[in-house]
Structure formats: C-alpha cells, structure tokens
Amino acid sequence: MSYLQDDKPVTLFELGKMRAEGRKIAMLTCYDASFAALLERNGVDVLLVGDSLGNVLQGQKSTLPVTLEQMAYHTECVVRGSSRPFVVTDMPFGSYQESPEQAMRNAARLMAAGAEMVKLEGGAFMAETVRFLVERGVPVCAHIGLTPQSVHQLGGYRVQGRSEEGAARLKADALALEQAGAALVVLEMVPAAVASDITRSLSTMATIGIGAGADCSGQVLVLHDMIGVYPGKKARFVKNFMEGAASIDAAVAAYVAAVKDGSFPAAEHCY
C-alpha cells in the first residue's frame, strides 16, 4: 500500500505564510500511519505526535509516564503514513527541562525519527532552551496556558489567564518565546479574549488554539476527542465531529473546513 500523495508538502515557511495571510492552520494529533494517511487526504496541515498518546492509547491518567523512545516510535509511524502535512512531535516530560543541552540531545533523537519540529511546554523560563535549539537547526513549537506536563503544579486541568495578572504573564511568555525563535505556540485553555490579544501582539509566531477562541492562527484537537472516542466527560473546547458524519473521513474533512472558515471553535467551545 502506498500512502504517498501528490500535494506539495507543508513546510515551516508555508505555515508562516499562512499566518501572515490570515489562512487558518488545521492541526490534529496523530499517532500511527493509517490515521496519518487519513488526516492527510482530508487536508490537515499539521500532524502533532502528541504525548497525549499516554492518555488515549496507553490509558494513563496523565502524559507524565510517556517516554522519549515511545515518542520516537510513534513519530516514525506517522512519518511513514504521510508526506504532505508538517509533523510536530512533543518532547515528553523530563526530556528537556534539565538543560538546553539535554533538550538538544533528545530533540535530535526525535528529528532523526522524522519530526520536523519539536514541541515543549513552558513560558519565558524556557526561552533559553528554545533559542539554543533554534540556533542549532531545530524548529520549536512552544506551549503555554494549561500545560499538561505541569498538571499537578497547576492543581488540575484549569483555565489559565483569567486574572489580569495571569493574562499579562501569558502575553509576556508568548513574546519571550517568539523572541527566542519559536515559530508556533499552542495556547491551551486560555480565555478567548486573552488569546486574541496575544495573537495580535505577535509579529511572526503563529498561535494554535485548543480551548483558546477562534482568533488564533489555527486550531488543534486530540484526534480521539474530535471523533468522539474519549473516556469520561467531554471537555468544553471539544466538538465531536463524528456526530452526523458518515465516516471518519467526513468528520476530519468537516473539522478542517470548520477551522478554515472560522466556524470552529464556536462560542460554546470557548472560555
């Protein structure tokens, strides 16, 4: 079976162009070759090999137990199944927090597995590490707001940036990460007005929202959430695109269309 597509690959340059032109970026998590091919043929721009695999594939209560080798393995699977989408891989907990050198060593492992960018969590305090990686040829996606690897420190899965002080801190984090060279930043569970202000304040870095309103440069959801395969209570920012869809292909195509035309997220998915 060949998964190869004729479409021109999405590059970091193209993502920057999309941001500048106001064209929305559609991202979904992906963990294997079959879904990588499915997401590709339905127009997903970016595949995020997320450490959320700990939750949705392994049944873990958090992302913390996920290992670097597991992330590399799933990256290899996704890359085999796709050719057009840009592939971003999460750096798992404990693989980058110690030092920029540790981050570089482990980012190199993920890049060798096929990642085109690595994602790491944290605000301005991670700027030194981001700069270290970017200067050495590793594109970086930052992640602020609700950062799942810090769930215990944050006291659970809570909206971040509700207070004036919290909103100002998130904006300062985003600006510091942009200055350090991050090309993308995920804004998770952030009030829509705060995410909109952050997006407008940035010069080059694209914002990818998950529970952060419709004004971000793009959107991301966990694949399993988007197709209604999730245990327990559905998060407010999730829409089940399988409802009314004839197939998973149709659901993914509907998600991409809704992101592109700005109809997702709607008000009921925002904080």
Curated annotation (Swiss-Prot):
Protein's cellular compartments: Cytoplasm
Annotated coiled-coil segments of the chain: none
Reactions mediated catalytically: 3-methyl-2-oxobutanoate + (6R)-5,10-methylene-5,6,7,8-tetrahydrofolate + H2O = 2-dehydropantoate + (6S)-5,6,7,8-tetrahydrofolate
Residues binding 3-methyl-2-oxobutanoate, per UniProt: 51-52, 90, 119
Pathway listed: Cofactor biosynthesis; (R)-pantothenate biosynthesis; (R)-pantoate from 3-methyl-2-oxobutanoate: step 1/2
Keywords assigned: Cytoplasm, Magnesium, Metal-binding, Pantothenate biosynthesis, Transferase
CDD domains tied to this protein: KPHMT-like
Swiss-Prot/TrEMBL GO biological process terms: pantothenate biosynthetic process
Keyword Electron transport: no
Record EC number: 2.1.2.11
Similarity remark: Belongs to the PanB family.
Role of this protein: Catalyzes the reversible reaction in which hydroxymethyl group from 5,10-methylenetetrahydrofolate is transferred onto alpha-ketoisovalerate to form ketopantoate.
Name assigned to this protein: 3-methyl-2-oxobutanoate hydroxymethyltransferase
Naturally occurring in which organism (per UniProt): Azoarcus sp. (strain BH72)
Gene expressing this chain: panB
